């Protein structure tokens, strides 16, 4: 009755009454008895029954996941099959399926068109504010801001007393260069635009009136186009003069003199100028001649029998020719000292001064001197102060940039020569050809040739080679007959072999300047290159510290590598320190 009164609102059934019955708790004696009792052994049938009862109460998640995955896979398979069956587009469609019929855009087309017009007007206002690019403007529209942007774009700097002319925007716009010479440059030789050093040098080195052109001190990297930078002003000046007959050329000698440190560079410049003269089709019979060591005096005499307008020579050989009275320097109007820093490094400073003393003093006022260098050392500055009159200083890039095109520098700690050879073979295969391998001793050239000639076409270049052998080696590398040149420092300057992919310093140079000019054989004219240097651990620590700093500071491709192992061996301490947080 008590229960019925408490739950009188509930409808009671027999089942609910049965469920409400309270079972009597297990007797404590039975619990103690079951605890002390031993294990109960179950038969096989009993164990199977217990397992089945438990399995019925649990959900197998693995089975459920497998079922779901099977369903999804079946759906994907069916979709894939339907896609395979409908590879071709079906153009026979029912017009009733057109979902755009009766489409009403949320934005009114008229309003949308107004928005677009406002956006266009905003672009026009921005363009009016910023102005057109200097490339899009006419020459008369250029202002100081445009010229400043152009100089920054090509990394051109210039300084000097007096007015400095603006850089060339193209070959023909300012009419500084003769029209037919411009046509030879663009159509005959395929030079679409001037390089940075040409842009700033040419307009300032060519006089617009009959006055003597300005002296130039130029700082630029190898492969930057210096040859045309001084050749075009020379040719423009010669073009303004009357044609000279052969006997007058022989009597007065050349009108332009170019001094260079190596015979290879002299021949290269001569070929480049004569190429331009051939494309120019100038009627004045202008010609360029190079005289270098390795040719006999009779050969040089035969070369100079008809005189020349432009003479390219190394200092030592030119002195020999002057002593033998094969040429005179009475009428030099244009003097070029190319790679002046290298000529000084090679000990040609006294020879240069001796040659300059042969130039007649009364012609000094009418002579233009152009000096080009990769590095502006104190010796070069001394030469410039002594022989240049109020020069215009022009440079392309920073001091570091003047020594580095797009070169990735890699340093390897190799150990002995056998390990070096193993690295060398891998680098030649991995980094591409043609390649130049620099060594310090000519005996090493023979040793390497013996071990590499089975896989590569090798030519060598060192001091024991005759002039004909040197010229043949360079020509083979240029033509592709050979793909590896092994050379001492004699080839580090002046060589212009296109598309050199790899430079290997098999033996580190004794001077750091030589290292710079070795690696400058690759990465020329805007192309990328790789320079690999092998170190054994026996090199001069001070030299390697310079190398480490240069590799760190000059990294245009952000791929340079100077291994920590080398840094530790040579005691090179990083300037940065890990911060300690307490």
Swiss-Prot record:
Record-listed E.C. numbers: 3.6.4.13
One Gene Ontology cellular component annotation held by this UniProt entry: cytoplasm
UniProt-listed InterPro entries: DEAD/DEAH_box_helicase_dom, Helicase_ATP-bd, Helicase_C-like, P-loop_NTPase, RNA-helicase_DEAD-box_CS
Question: What's one Pfam family the UniProt record gives for this protein?
Answer: DEAD
Q: Give the motif span (DEAD box).
A: 338-341
Reactions mediated catalytically: ATP + H2O = ADP + phosphate + H(+)
Q: Describe the location of the Helicase C-terminal domain by residue ranges.
A: 416-570
Q: Where does ATP bind?
A: 220-227
Q: Which GO terms describe its biological process?
A: mRNA 5'-splice site recognition
A molecular-function term among this protein's GO annotations: RNA helicase activity
What are the record keywords, sorted?
ATP-binding, Cytoplasm, Helicase, Hydrolase, mRNA processing, mRNA splicing, Nucleotide-binding, Nucleus
The chain positions of domain Helicase ATP-binding read 207-394
Q: Which SMART domains match?
A: DEXDc (SM00487), HELICc (SM00490)
Q: Know anything about its domains from the record?
A: The Q motif is unique to and characteristic of the DEAD box family of RNA helicases and controls ATP binding and hydrolysis.
Q: What does this protein do?
A: ATP-dependent RNA helicase involved in mRNA splicing. May destabilize the U1/5'-splice site duplex to permit an effective competition for the 5'-splice site by the U6 snRNA, resulting in the switch between U1 and U6 at the 5'-splice site. May also act to unwind the U4/U6 base-pairing interaction in the U4/U6/U5 snRNP, facilitating the first covalent step of splicing.
Q: Which family does it belong to?
A: Belongs to the DEAD box helicase family. DDX23/PRP28 subfamily.
Q: How does it assemble?
A: Component of the U5 snRNP complex.
- Indicate what this protein is called per its UniProt record: Pre-mRNA-splicing ATP-dependent RNA helicase PRP28
The gene from which this protein is expressed is: PRP28
